[in-house]
């Protein structure tokens, strides 16, 4: 009897020891594992478990009523008591390895070989994690059960200037735009923003221009206009419109204005503060109150033919030793720049004139409507006078 009581006592002791170990393992799961363990991927955990000599002693916590399938046996889940379920230190941590099967659900076991099945298992595991673990303890950095992390697309992310976080999917689209005076007409861009001439080009351009001016004060400009007459007869018709004296006076006036513009431009080629205001204003003057004021309307494409005539004349300026490729490139840049600025001024003035005409039409229509309403009211008042009763 003494031996039997001893055996029973030892047996009882073993049972109680196993129960305490079982209870301690559950406490280890909830107390020993730190908060950052939920952010550790399953691959890293498996690598650390494979490096250690002993197998993992902690059994994962599963959902109530769910069993996990181990090779050769079924182990019931470890359910936390109400004390741990209601505690603030509850942390969900999965200690599954690659040798263990996924969490068993109500649906039949799926084959994990295909990517579609793996995604379905991952979705069920993530749903189970949200059901068991409080939302405040779920790590922000989530990984799928395969352990792979999807790096954010840094190429398609743009940091907001007013906010501290980044907005994914917003691509920064920066476009290099040339300065425009449509938004603010009083601000004109500088010349150096458009013309990028080298010092040798500036030197040869000034030298050839002075040589052409020595032949006559207005000779370079007059030769350019006469050459443009052969490019397009409309240019000749507009400048020489009217009597012979009127045409020559108009040609002389154009040559004087063009010479002044070219003198200012060539003198300020290397000036950082020189603007294109003079060229824009010259282009604006080609918008006339009457469309056919000088025989035919002025079009912007006529300036292209004027540029061709000017380039042909620049090749003849200067001494023969100065007519180099450097000089020709410098003059070509200047001619194209001048015609482009004249076009800009002409087109801006056209838009402004159209807006003014539209406003005049609307104001005229509203005034006529007011006049008609006033006449109707006066007729009604006269109808109720004593004379008509």
Swiss-Prot record:
GO biological process: oxygen transport; response to hypoxia
Feature: compositional bias, Basic residues: 16-25
Zinc as UniProt keyword: no
Domain of life: Eukaryota
Residues annotated as binding heme b: 254, 286
Stretches assigned to the Globin domain: 196-347
One Pfam family here: Globin
Biased composition (Basic and acidic residues): 376-389
Compositional bias (Polar residues): 1-15
InterPro entries: Globin (IPR000971), Globin-like_OT (IPR050532), Globin-like_sf (IPR009050), Globin/Proto (IPR012292), Mb-like_M (IPR044399)
Gene3D superfamilies linked: Globins (1.10.490.10)
MF terms in GO: heme binding; iron ion binding; oxygen binding; oxygen carrier activity
Record's function text: May play a role as physiological sensor for oxygen via redox signaling and/or electron transport.
Similarity-based family: Belongs to the globin family.
Name of the protein described by the UniProt record: Globin-like protein 6
Record lineage: Eukaryota, Metazoa, Ecdysozoa, Nematoda, Chromadorea
Gene encoding the protein: glb-6
């Amino acid at each position: 009897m003494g031996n039997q009581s001893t055996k029973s006592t030892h047996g009882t002791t073993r049972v109680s020891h196993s129960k305490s170990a079982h209870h301690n393992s559950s406490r280890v799961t909830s107390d020993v594992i730190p908060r950052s363990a939920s952010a550790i991927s399953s691959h890293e955990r498996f690598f650390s478990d494979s490096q250690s000599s002993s197998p993992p002693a902690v059994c994962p916590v599963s959902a109530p009523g769910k069993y996990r399938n181990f090779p050769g046996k079924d182990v019931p889940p470890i359910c936390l008591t109400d004390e741990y379920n209601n505690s603030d230190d509850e942390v969900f941590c999965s200690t599954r390895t690659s040798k263990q099967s996924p969490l068993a659900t109500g649906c039949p076991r799926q084959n994990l070989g295909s990517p579609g099945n793996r995604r379905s298992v991952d979705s069920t595991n993530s749903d189970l994690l949200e059901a068991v673990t409080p939302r405040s303890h779920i790590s922000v950095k989530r990984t799928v059960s395969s352990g792979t992390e999807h790096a954010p697309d840094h190429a398609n992310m743009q940091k907001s200037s007013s906010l501290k976080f980044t907005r994914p999917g917003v691509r920064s689209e920066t476009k290099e735009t040339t300065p425009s005076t449509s938004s603010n007409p009083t601000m004109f861009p500088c010349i150096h923003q458009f013309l990028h001439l080298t010092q040798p080009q500036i030197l040869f351009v000034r030298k050839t221009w002075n040589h052409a001016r020595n032949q006559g004060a207005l000779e370079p400009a007059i030769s350019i206009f006469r050459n443009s007459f052969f490019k397009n007869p409309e240019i000749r018709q507009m400048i020489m419109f009217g009597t012979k004296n009127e045409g020559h006076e108009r040609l002389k006036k154009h040559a004087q204005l063009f010479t002044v513009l070219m003198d200012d431009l060539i003198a300020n080629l290397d000036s950082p503060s020189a603007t294109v205001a003079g060229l824009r204003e010259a282009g604006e003057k080609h918008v006339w109150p009457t469309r056919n004021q000088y025989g035919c309307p002025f079009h912007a494409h006529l300036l292209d033919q004027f540029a061709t005539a000017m380039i042909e004349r620049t090749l003849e300026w200067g001494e023969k030793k100065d007519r180099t490729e450097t000089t020709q490139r410098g003059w070509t840049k200047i001619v194209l720049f001048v015609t482009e600025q004249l076009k800009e001024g002409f087109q801006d003035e056209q838009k402004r004139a159209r807006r003014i005409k539209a406003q005049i039409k609307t104001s005229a229509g509203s005034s006529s409507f007011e006049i008609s309403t006033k006449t109707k009211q006066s007729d009604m008042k006269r109808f109720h006078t004593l004379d008509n009763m």
